Each structure stands twice: as structure tokens, then as C-alpha cells.
UniProtKB/Swiss-Prot annotation:
It is a single-pass membrane protein. Pfam families: PsbY. Keywords: Chloroplast, Membrane, Photosynthesis, Photosystem II, Plastid, Thylakoid, Transmembrane, Transmembrane helix. One of its GO terms (biological process) is photosynthesis. This is Photosystem II reaction center protein Y. It comes from the Eukaryota. Loosely associated component of the core of photosystem II (PSII), it is not always seen in crystals. PSII is a light-driven water plastoquinone oxidoreductase, using light energy to abstract electrons from H(2)O, generating a proton gradient subsequently used for ATP formation. NCBIfam families: PRK13240.1. It is found in: Plastid, Chloroplast thylakoid membrane. It comes from Pyropia yezoensis (Susabi-nori).
Amino acid sequence: MDSRLLVVLIPVLAAASWAVYNIGRVALQQFRKMTS
């Protein structure tokens, strides 16, 4: 594994996982509002 590839991949993966986490959290709140 090339270290330069990791330097590029780590921030991209961090940003992607952060986006998925935020979207999932908001979606869950909306879902709870609809069901309650």
C-alpha cells in the first residue's frame, strides 16, 4: 500500500463516514417523528 494513497483515502473516508452518520441521524429523527 502506497503511503500517499492512504494520505488521500483517510480524509475522504472520514468525510464520507461523517456525512453518512449525519444523514442517518437526521433520517432517524424524521422517521421517529412520523411514527410517533
